[in-house]
């Protein structure tokens, strides 16, 4: 909370001079009566899922049909948004395969099949921009690994922006404006910002995939859910189109 307050105070003279309770109210963390808002609980609460169980992540590796098991490493992640981001990226790191590569000295090293930056950005995007309305109250962010695809699905579709605009400098729109503003001032345990606050997460994922020589991310919006797909391997998986 101290780090959040310090970051917020740097943005405005009025906020710099306000009491802590005022800062939290003006930033939408607390209501006027001092209770946590939904955005505040989700972003900064100790256990948001105790209030709304859907404010979590379900992740699993989907196995090939015909086997005894349908999934591997099925987890239900809980905690405030920054912790969800850390847990989900760690889960991805242990389940996405690595390729053999070499460092500048010629030493053999393991290189992840997908750029970690792209993985982190699509997860952060799903967490920050998921719909929080009652219609999606029973829906979690879902992460799946299916063959050579990393799939992240969040409740709710795009608002104020089209699929074609994703990644464009002017193609940004916060589904949850209050949550977005809160997250601009939050960091994970390793000191990284949850979001940069410039709407560049999708663009960063696109650049990371291109730099790795991989297919562009694929995005799908069907109104009730938004899906981002990252694929490793040179050829697009069957039934997929490359993103723009």
Regions found by a protein language model. Give the residues of each.
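Flexible, glycine-/charge-rich segments associated with ATP-binding catalytic modules
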Residues: 50, 142, 160-244
């Amino acid at each position: 909370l101290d780090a959040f307050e310090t970051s917020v105070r740097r943005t405005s003279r009025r906020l710099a001079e306000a009491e802590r309770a005022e800062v939290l109210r003006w930033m939408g963390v607390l209501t006027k009566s001092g209770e946590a808002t939904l955005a505040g609980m989700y972003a900064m609460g100790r256990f948001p899922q105790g209030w709304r169980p859907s404010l979590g992540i379900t992740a699993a590796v989907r196995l090939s049909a015909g086997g005894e098991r349908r999934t591997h490493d099925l987890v239900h992640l809980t905690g405030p948004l920054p912790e969800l981001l850390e847990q989900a990226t760690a889960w991805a790191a242990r389940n996405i395969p690595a390729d053999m590569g070499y460092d500048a000295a010629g030493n053999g090293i393991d290189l992840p099949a997908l750029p970690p930056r792209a993985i982190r950005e699509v997860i952060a995007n799903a967490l920050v921009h998921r719909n929080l309305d009652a219609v999606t109250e029973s829906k979690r962010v879902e992460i799946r690994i299916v063959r050579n695809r990393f799939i992240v699905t969040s409740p709710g579709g795009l608002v104020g922006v089209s699929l074609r605009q994703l990644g464009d400098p002017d193609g940004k729109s916060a589904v949850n404006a209050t949550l977005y503003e809160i997250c601009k001032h939050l960091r994970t345990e390793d000191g990284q910002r949850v979001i940069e606050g410039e709407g560049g997460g999708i663009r960063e994922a696109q650049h990371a995939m291109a730099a790795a020589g991989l297919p562009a991310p694929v995005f799908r919006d069907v109104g009730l859910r938004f899906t981002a797909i990252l694929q490793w391997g040179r050829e697009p998986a069957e039934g997929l189109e490359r993103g723009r």
